[in-house]
Amino acid sequence: MKPVLQGALAWIYAGYKTASRGHLLPYTRHQKFHSSSLISEQAKRAKDLIKLVNSSSLSNSESQSLDWRSDLKVPEWKRQKLALKDKFKGQQWNPKKKLSREQMENVRLLKRHFPETSATELSERFQVSPEVIRRILKSKWQPNEEEQLQLQTRWKRRSERVNEILGSPEHQKLPPKKLVLGSGRTDTDLQVKSVRRTAVKAGRNSSSPKGKQKLNLLSKLIS
């Protein structure tokens, strides 16, 4: 283990001792060396050190005890943090995925044609929990004619908005092309290397003298 990492971990784990007067006094040099040697024995890699730090943290010890629920001295922000940690059981934030109606119908269709398929296999396919698949298969709700008409009307409005956005002149206008010409050291003829599309900047005057000279040169080369 590197000396710098040992020193940093020794500083983390050494902590402070509370004196009788209420002041905080650091540990002695012997205690720091002893704590760093214990850390190097318990954790050999950086991942093990991170796990060791998290397991010995104050919030972890507080979450394991049930006194924080009845302790009025615990601040509200820490109470919410411990409650979320208890709810998710240490897992990272992973919001549930919501399936659309078409995907729900696909789940029912797959289960109807392949009855031997389990809920776990379907959940892996649709990237949801098996409980979601069980609820979908258990549900017998079907939209009536009025609800189906409302759904179709809503999807029609969405498609019209998408077509309006894609059909606007800004999306239909293609950027102008730019010819990249080049020749070898021994060749006398110019060759087109590539054709690039360049976006025209706003407020740029295309009828400038420099642009006209380039167009005249290009027309002579092509002819």
UniProtKB/Swiss-Prot annotation:
Protein purpose: Required for respiratory activity and maintenance and expression of the mitochondrial genome.
Organism, scientific name: Lachancea thermotolerans (strain ATCC 56472 / CBS 6340 / NRRL Y-8284)
Name of the protein this chain belongs to: Required for respiratory growth protein 9, mitochondrial
A cellular component annotation (GO) from this entry: mitochondrion
UniProt cross-references to InterPro entries, sorted A to Z: NGRN/Rrg9 (IPR010487)
Region (Disordered): 166-223
Entry keyword set: Mitochondrion, Transit peptide
Protein family: Belongs to the RRG9 family.
Keyword Nuclease in record: no
Main subcellular location: mitochondrion
Keyword NAD: no
Annotated localization: Mitochondrion
